[in-house]
């Protein structure tokens, strides 16, 4: 998380190797990603950019683009998790409904949900959501992320966000400020130790919401201890 222009997208774009690191390295399962063929690397990734990308065809071909041999059940499950079925089911042709090049015949939120469904249907090792929830209303955002958390429990999930509510319950939050890491930790830890994060949180959440989030995290830790 961080303000516009702080380097969030630049950082995650290093993972699919849109460009390479100039120092240090990025490893996946202990292997430097520069030693992996680009095609093989990207097969392991489910990447959803800031602006959803759709192709001419139909809804089904767009969702299953990264999993051409997948089943209808996989497609429907991905659409359900991405909260896309609510508008797909209203269309006469359902999953065979045509999509124009660039998705010009669907709304921004619908385009984003289909892009998210495509990533889910791919069953990737690593999900990268680059501010992918910004076009969604708050209720859809919350419902989608809850369903996504259940589905992606065996994968690494990286979420770039400007809305603090999107990353509130992440295992680890990285705060960027002017291209540098300003803090790392949970929501509760960062509220105490990171002025940049605290400023973002207080500008977006009410005192009541902040306290509720802290209580949820505390309860979650107690459950883990007693469990």
Regions inferred by a protein language model and the residue ranges of each:
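ABC-type nucleotide-binding domain
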Residues: 1-227
């Amino acid at each position: 998380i961080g303000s516009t222009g702080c380097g969030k997208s630049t950082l995650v774009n290093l993972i699919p190797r849109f460009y390479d690191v100039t120092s240090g390295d990025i490893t996946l399962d202990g292997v430097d990603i520069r030693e992996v063929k680009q095609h093989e690397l990207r097969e392991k990734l489910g990447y959803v950019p800031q602006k959803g990308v759709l192709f001419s065809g139909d809804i089904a071909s767009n969702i299953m683009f990264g999993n051409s041999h997948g089943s209808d059940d996989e497609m429907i499950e991905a659409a359900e998790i991405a909260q896309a079925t609510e508008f797909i089911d209203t269309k006469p042709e359902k999953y065979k409904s045509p999509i124009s090049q660039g998705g010009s015949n669907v709304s921004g939120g619908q385009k984003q949900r289909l892009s998210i469904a495509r990533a889910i249907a791919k069953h990737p090792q690593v999900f990268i959501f680059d501010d992918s929830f910004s076009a969604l209303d708050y209720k859809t955002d919350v419902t989608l992320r809850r369903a996504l958390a259940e589905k992606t429990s065996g994968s690494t999930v990286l979420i770039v966000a400007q809305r603090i509510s999107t990353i509130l319950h992440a295992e680890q939050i990285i705060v960027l400020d002017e291209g540098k890491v300003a803090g790392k930790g949970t929501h509760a830890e960062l509220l105490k130790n990171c002025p940049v994060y605290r400023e973002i949180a207080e500008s977006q959440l009410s005192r009541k919401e902040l306290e509720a989030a802290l209580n949820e995290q505390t309860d979650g830790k107690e459950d883990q201890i007693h469990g």
